From Swiss-Prot:
Belongs to the universal ribosomal protein uL1 family. SUPFAM superfamilies: Ribosomal protein L1. It comes from Geobacter sulfurreducens (strain ATCC 51573 / DSM 12127 / PCA). Part of the 50S ribosomal subunit. Disulfide bonds: none annotated. Binds directly to 23S rRNA. The L1 stalk is quite mobile in the ribosome, and is involved in E site tRNA release. This is Large ribosomal subunit protein uL1. InterPro entries: Ribosom_uL1_bac-type (IPR005878), Ribosomal_uL1 (IPR002143), Ribosomal_uL1-like (IPR023674), Ribosomal_uL1/biogenesis (IPR028364), Ribosomal_uL1_3-a/b-sand (IPR016095), Ribosomal_uL1_CS (IPR023673). The lineage of its organism: Bacteria, Pseudomonadati, Thermodesulfobacteriota, Desulfuromonadia, Geobacterales. Pfam families: Ribosomal_L1. The keyword Protease does not apply.
Amino acid sequence: MPNTAKKHREALAKIDRSRTYPLVEGIESVKSAAYAKFDETVEVAVRLGVDPRHADQMVRGAVVLPNGLGKDVRVLVFAKGEKEKEAREAGADYVGAEDLVTKIQEGWFEFDTAIATPDMMGVVGKIGKLLGPRGLMPNPKVGTVTFDVGRAVKESKAGKVEFRVEKAGIVHAPVGKVSFDADKLKENLLALVEALLKAKPSAAKGTYVKKISISSTMGPGLNLDISDVQAKLV
């Protein structure tokens, strides 16, 4: 524990919390400050000028990160017949229907994302209270309720990230691992920001993107220069 505390202090010393960092410098600083023995996830927090208590200011969506997440995503699909076959051929880890519902009711959650064909939602609805709080409930707004299960599976495997604004108006999302080079993390972060801009509610007034911060799982966070980030969007 003392050794961990020392490493954290050393990591904090590498970050100037009083300034905002240009995008690339910020990413490189987060990479250099990471100290855990495992490959830490690089996480982004974006504070938006919305009040999610109002339905017309909810921000929700998904984006396929161009360089993936650096981890194996376990995909579960609720489907039958030809769609079951399509899901398996696309690389889904688990495919089924009522049998999977039973396993989940018994406490099994060994998967990272769930996809369902629309005709299966009546079955999936039985476990909505189990999947919902874990962020695993299939939803048409993020493309996980669809008949195009092959595409949905491939996107999830490739590094699809779902995002949803929280009560404080903040969106949290992973953009890769500290082992990624800075350019790959930059491309992933820009893809996320672009998706957030596209998801801007028409009811949102004033400044939309108020703050962007980045950190690793164990390391300290820092604030990015919003104007520099937006200038790099294609």
